[in-house]
Amino acid sequence: MIYNCKRTATVESCNYGTLAALKKENFLELQNSTFENIIEVFKKQICLYDDEVKMFLAFAMEKISYFKHLKLLTKQEIFHSMERVTYEKDALLCKKGDIATKLFVIQDGIVEVACKYAPRIDEEFVIERLGRGSIINHRSFMLEDDADTDFRCLTSVSCFELTADKIKEIKDKREDMRTAYRTVEEEVLIP
């Protein structure tokens, strides 16, 4: 409800547990009428969750230079804006010439980065094979740049996706994300 995503944490009960549910309309009523800053309090509490998926994403995303300088709440918003998607073997994540609209963080599987030798030769030259923790399009999806190569699933691939639209929503709300955008634009567009 807070991040408009399906999950914010994995909860395991080792002995027994009590489960409660709060409908979205009741949550919104609580937010609007009772506590002015309840969302921020909840977001700060979510930061304390020791969740395997969150830790994996945090570790992987720290490889991105602009991500390192973001505030913790901005990082959390990014994590919870990602969607887990599974692709079958031979599926294309990106095709050469297509506009990059998503950032991908590979959780499981192998993605092959390849290009054609020459227009008349049908064989592909494999540039690299990307595995768990690899990130695809971390800059180009922000700039809506076109892909220079094909990204094909060598095996079935499970990954987390962040759309350009979602990152723009975060940018509109968070000053540190706007700064990150400017940094990327300066690095890429200004020689």
Go through the PLM ranges and name each one.
Residues 1-191:
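Cytosolic regulatory regions built on CNB/CRP/Popeye-like sensor folds
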